[in-house]
């Protein structure tokens, strides 16, 4: 079976409501998407870093419990695993996020996972735009491109981290160029291209290498932009009560759909609008499942059904490819 390689931050989020802590959970769309994908029976590796402290143990244990391969997580003995305190906004206000972290000088010294043709590499977060992790991360991403993998990029970074977007804009544009598929939310796009509509941002910055862009919004259906193609799903995008679960689930569902429908790097460009709608249907279904979950991942029952469907479908693909033609 083809593999998923997820490259992103390891962070523990703590949610506060009315100034009081409500719960702590593993943060990040990439880590949570990896957990769902592995739970659905797909070989999934997480490439990341965290300290050997108790917080790092919580994150690694969470991934292990969901069957994620954690051998490519660099456990540094100096410093502390990142923490994010999320203070829920009230009366329509945005959440306020305070980030904590203490890092060693030598970072992201990870063990590279095996990457084969048509594997799927998912990357994004602060690692993909800021030094010192970016240089090593992009070495791995460029290697994945050389190996013939499908590369999926999630622009944006942890809200609450402040730096001038102009400083990292060349890195963002390079990431957009190397990716086969880009998935971003309204807020991500507004922070990166604040004075442009979605259509303008796609035309001016994304639509250069034949890649596909999937746009998520709190107020509209997920929409595909690819060349002159436009396709959308008929439901509102995000569950406002669990944005992390929804977006992580959508990402996991889209990658699952690529495997289910046997979408490879070679035939991705030929995928028509109806084909993209099938992928979006699968992604939204998984997103709704994860948004309803307390740990932002698919349930055991959902995972079992998805794994069985994928296994049976792959067996049919294999049988049809080996059956002699008359």
Enumerate the language-model features and the residues they cover:
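Conserved phosphate-donor
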Residues: 181-191, 201-240
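Conserved beta-alpha-beta core of the PfkB/ribokinase-like small-molecule kinase fold
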Residues: 120, 125-200
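Alpha-helix C-terminal capping segments
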Residues: 33-43, 88, 257-259
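Short pre-catalytic strand/loop immediately N-terminal to key active-site residues, enriched for Gly-Thr
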Residues: 19-28, 233-246
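A short helix->loop->beta-strand "cap" motif at the edges of active sites that frequently abuts
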Residues: 2, 143-150, 207-213
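Conserved N-terminal subdomain of the carbohydrate kinase-like
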Residues: 14-20, 42-125, 300, 304-326
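Conserved post-catalytic alpha-helical subdomain immediately downstream of the catalytic base
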Residues: 236-321
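Positively charged, low-complexity intrinsically disordered leader regions
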Residues: 1-17
């Amino acid at each position: 079976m083809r593999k998923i390689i997820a490259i992103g931050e390891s962070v523990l989020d703590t949610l506060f409501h009315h100034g009081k802590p409500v719960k702590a959970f593993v943060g990040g769309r990439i880590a949570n998407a990896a957990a769902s994908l592995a739970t659905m029976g797909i070989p999934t590796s997480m490439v990341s870093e965290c300290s050997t402290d108790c917080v790092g143990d919580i994150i690694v244990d969470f991934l292990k419990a969901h069957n994620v391969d954690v051998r490519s997580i660099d456990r540094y003995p100096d410093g502390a695993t990142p923490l994010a305190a999320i203070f829920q906004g009230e009366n329509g206000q945005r959440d306020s996020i305070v980030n904590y972290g203490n890092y060693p000088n030598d970072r992201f010294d990870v063990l590279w996972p095996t990457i084969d043709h048509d594997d799927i590499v998912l990357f994004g977060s602060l690692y993909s735009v800021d030094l010192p992790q970016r240089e090593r991360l992009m070495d791995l991403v460029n290697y994945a491109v050389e190996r013939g993998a499908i590369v999926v990029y999630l622009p944006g970074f942890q809200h609450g981290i402040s730096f001038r977007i102009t400083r990292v804009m060349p890195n963002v544009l390079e990431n957009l160029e190397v990716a086969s598929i880009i998935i971003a939310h309204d807020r991500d796009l507004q922070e990166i291209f604040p004075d442009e509509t979605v259509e303008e941002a796609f035309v001016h910055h994304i639509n250069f290498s034949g890649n596909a862009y999937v746009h998520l919004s709190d107020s509209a259906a997920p929409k595909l932009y690819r060349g002159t193609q436009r396709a959308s799903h008929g439901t509102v995008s995000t569950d406002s009560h669990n944005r992390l679960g929804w977006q992580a689930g959508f990402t996991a569902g889209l990658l699952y759909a690529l495997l289910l429908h046997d979408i490879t790097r070679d035939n991705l460009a030929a995928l028509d609008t109806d084909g993209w709608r099938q992928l979006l249907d699968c992604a939204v279904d998984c997103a709704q499942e994860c948004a309803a979950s307390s740990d932002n991942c698919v349930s055991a029952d959902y995972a079992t059904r998805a794994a069985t469907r994928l296994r049976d479908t792959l067996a049919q693909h294999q049988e049809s490819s080996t059956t002699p033609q008359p």
